[in-house]
Amino acid sequence: MGEIDAGGSFRRIMNYFLDTNIILILFFNRDNELEPTILSILRDNRNSFFASTVSLLEIAQLYRRRKFKDIDYKVFDTGDKLIDLILSRLEEIEVLPFERREARIASRLTFVPNHKDPNDLAIMAHAISEQMPIISCDDKFPEYISQGIIVLYNKRSTK
């Protein structure tokens, strides 16, 4: 699927799966951490963006461990309040349920050296299941390409 842009060039319209770190960068308005090509993809309203319910679980776990420096834990006294705000502010992201099909794919993925995060395997499995490239800042994700994932790796910059 695609369209011809104003300059006469063919422009492919894409679906993208977002890793938790990208969701949080968007929520906290830290665009300076995004490479120009990734930022361009994320700002293009012709693209569609998806995430896994596993990312919501990861956000809840990060909240529980008080890993967010940019939020007031008195205002967000429960993790679900933070998740609700993230989902309302980033309404262009459709959250998809993690189901049996994704669990089966995750069970076939094998960890690469120095990477043991089961949430990451679940999120990658979800992207594989949906046949979408995943946008992530996790430098381990590209090491899974041989296992069927398509990764758009964003090397964080702190300009």
What would you call each of these model-derived segments?
Residues 1-51, 68-83, 156-159:
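Short, well-structured N-terminal submotif of metal-dependent ribonuclease cores
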Residues 2-13, 124-159:
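Acidic, PIN/NYN-like endoribonuclease modules and their adjacent C-terminal/linker elements
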Residues 51-54, 98:
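Short glycine/serine/threonine-enriched helix-capping/active-site loop
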Residues 59:
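Phosphate/NTP-binding elements of NTP-utilizing enzymes
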Residues 89-137:
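Active-site neighborhoods of divalent-metal-dependent phosphate/nucleic-acid chemistry enzymes
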